[in-house]
Amino acid sequence: MSYFTKLPAVLLLEDGTVFQGKAAGKIGTTTGEICFNTGMTGYQEIFTDPSYFGQIMVATNAHIGNYGIADAEVESGNIQIAGLVCKNYNIAYSRKQADESIQDYFQEQNIVGISDIDTRQLVRHIRDKGAMNAIISSEILDLEELKAKLSKVPSMDGLELSSKVSTKETYTFGDEKAAYRVAVLDLGVKKNILRNFDDRDVYAKVYPAKTTYAEMEKDFAPNGYFISNGPGDPSAMPYAVETVKEILANDKPMFGICLGHQLLALANDIPTKKMFNGHRGLNHPVKNIIINHCEVTSQ
C-alpha cells in the first residue's frame, strides 16, 4: 500500500494537552504512558523491545517507516509499544531487504498511532512535565469521552509487567558446545542480547520470569546468571528480587541490564527511583565514577 486517505486522529495527554493529527496504523483507540525515544534509526527494534510494553512512543526522528519493516530486525515476537506518535508516517519504503510497509505491519498487529503533529513541541512538553498517561484515537474524536477513558488508565508506578512479556516456556539459544553456559531470567529480554551471548561463545538457557534460583541451578548448572531488561516497576517484583538475592547468597557470577540492573540494586537494599524522564535512545550518558566525568555511550 503506497497511498491511503489519512483520517483525523487526536492525542490527549493526562494534563489536558491536546494534539490534532492524522491516523496511523489501525483505526482505533489506545492508551499508555507517553514517552519519547531519540534514536535516529532502528524504529522497528524500538517497536518490538519488551522494555517499552504498555508505552506510547514518540519518535523524535521526523521520518518513521521510510525503510520499511524487515522480519530479521525484531527484538521480540510482537510489537510491544501501546501506540506510536510521529511527524511523518511513511507508507512507501525504498529498501529491498524490507518485507512489508509499516502500515501493513501495524494493521496486522492492531497498533494505533497518530502522525502529522509537531513532535518537537510534544517532546519539549514531556521533557518539562514528565512522563504521563495519554490516549490516541482515530475512532473517537470527542475530547470529553476521551478524558473519561483516560481517567481509568492505571499509572505505570506499581505495575508488574514482566510476567506479561516473559517467555512462557524455557528455551535455549546458541551452541550447546560453547565455552560458557548462562541462565537468562527473562523479564523481557531482547533477541539482540541473546545474539551477543552467542557471538561471545555463550550457550544461554532462557527461563520464565518467575523461575527460582533453585530451579535454574538444578536444571542447567550454569557458569553464571543474567537478569534481563524488561518493563514495569521493579518495586512490584518481589519474586525477582528474591531470586537475585538467592543467586548472590550462593556467590554465583551475575549481571543485569536495565530492569535487571535495578533488581540487583534492590536485592542489595539500594532503593531505586523512577526518573522524571527516562533515557530512551541510542546514546546514553554514563557517569565515570573513577574520573568523575559524564561520558556519552552508544548502546
What label would you give each PLM region?
Residues D201-Y203, F220-G224:
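Glycine-enriched alpha-helix->loop->beta-strand junction motifs that scaffold or abut catalytic
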Residues H125-I126, M216-E217, L266, H284:
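Short Asp/Glu-rich motifs
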Residues N223-G224, N229-S298:
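Cysteine-nucleophile active-site neighborhood
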Residues A70, N196, D219, A267-I270:
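Residue-level signal for well-ordered alpha-helical positions
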Residues Y213-A221:
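Short amphipathic alpha-helix with an adjacent loop that forms part of the alpha/beta core around
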